Amino acid sequence: MNAKPGLVAIYRWRIADEHVEAFRARWTHATRALKPHGGMGSLFARADDGTYYAVALWPDRETRERAFDATGNSEPWPPAERLEPILLDPIENLWPE
């Protein structure tokens, strides 16, 4: 990754076991579709309490908004309870480049 992210978005869901694989496939598709619009990648993970998280990196808030507007949400997502996303403005970034 050449540029450092100016925004980190943390998305959270509760997903029933029978929908996890379909949800993961849809998340992968969405992440790849956002890349040409400025998305810097994402990580999908499961916490100990069963909540699923995606941590997505963006150059800035405006790029994220434009990317979501450009890609739309025409494909349905598998059933999941979506929790409020958390948006972070990085102060110090020591992740590998």
Question: How should these model regions be labeled?
Answer:
Residues 2, 28-40, 57-92:
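An amphipathic, aromatic/His-enriched active-site/gating alpha helix that lines ligand/cofactor pockets
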Residues 14-25:
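Short, surface-exposed ligand-recognition loops at beta-strand->loop->(often short) alpha-helix junctions
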